[in-house]
């Protein structure tokens, strides 16, 4: 419910901007990352997005912290032919166990069968400045065929306890039509690594 409330807030705040644009089709996505964390609470991290032309709206839950939601508005840029790039600067509000404002970004760079993807945000905690933090998730992947990819992944998060400031690992992913499934294996040299299963749908 909090995730839906996040998206509703963003939609309400941007109603005027949407109607001021040319008539373009909405594009939506919904995804959930399920974290299996050693000696800690397992949890799901859902995200929904809505894009219309340059406008980008996004809502997340359990991303910055558990039992915490965030709502985002951003602007889509893209370009290139052989070297294709996309960049979405964003600004969001965070509320729940953590209350903050956060500038952020999402971006990708693609060439041949290689892709670099990164998303990040600087969370400025409105209660305790010492709790402010930079969150990041980055991937570099190779797709030998259209439906399969593998590569490396890193993340920096405070959603759960970890001895590592930057966690790193391996990933594999498959896609079929509008469905995308990924598996992430963080800190493979630990006795008990962290696993993440991601399922996403574009519509």
Residue ranges and their predicted role:
Residues 1-25, 203:
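Cleavable N-terminal export/targeting peptides
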Residues 26-36, 48, 52-64, 71, ...:
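Transmembrane beta-strand segments that form the barrel wall of outer-membrane beta-barrel proteins
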Residues 127-131:
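Acidic pyrophosphate-coordinating catalytic loop
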């Amino acid at each position: 419910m909090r995730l839906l409330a996040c998206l509703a807030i963003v939609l309400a705040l941007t109603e005027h901007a949407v109607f001021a644009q040319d008539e373009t089709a909405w594009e939506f996505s919904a995804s959930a990352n399920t974290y299996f964390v050693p000696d800690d609470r397992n949890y799901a991290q859902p995200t929904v997005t809505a894009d219309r032309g340059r406008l980008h709206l996004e809502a997340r839950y359990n991303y910055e912290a558990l039992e915490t939601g965030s709502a985002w508005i951003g602007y889509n840029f893209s370009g290139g032919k052989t070297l294709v790039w996309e960049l979405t600067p964003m600004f969001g509000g965070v509320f729940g166990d953590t209350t903050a404002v956060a500038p952020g970004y999402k971006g990708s760079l693609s060439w041949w069968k290689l892709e670099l993807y990164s998303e990040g945000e600087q969370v400025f905690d409105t209660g305790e400045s010492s709790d402010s933090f930079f969150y990041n998730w980055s991937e570099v992947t190779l797709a030998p065929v259209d439906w399969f990819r593998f590569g490396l992944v890193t993340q920096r998060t405070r959603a759960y306890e970890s001895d590592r400031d930057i966690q790193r690992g391996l990933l594999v992913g498959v896609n079929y039509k509008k469905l995308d499934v990924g598996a992430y294996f963080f800190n493979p040299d630990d006795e008990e690594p962290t696993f993440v299963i991601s399922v996403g749908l574009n519509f």
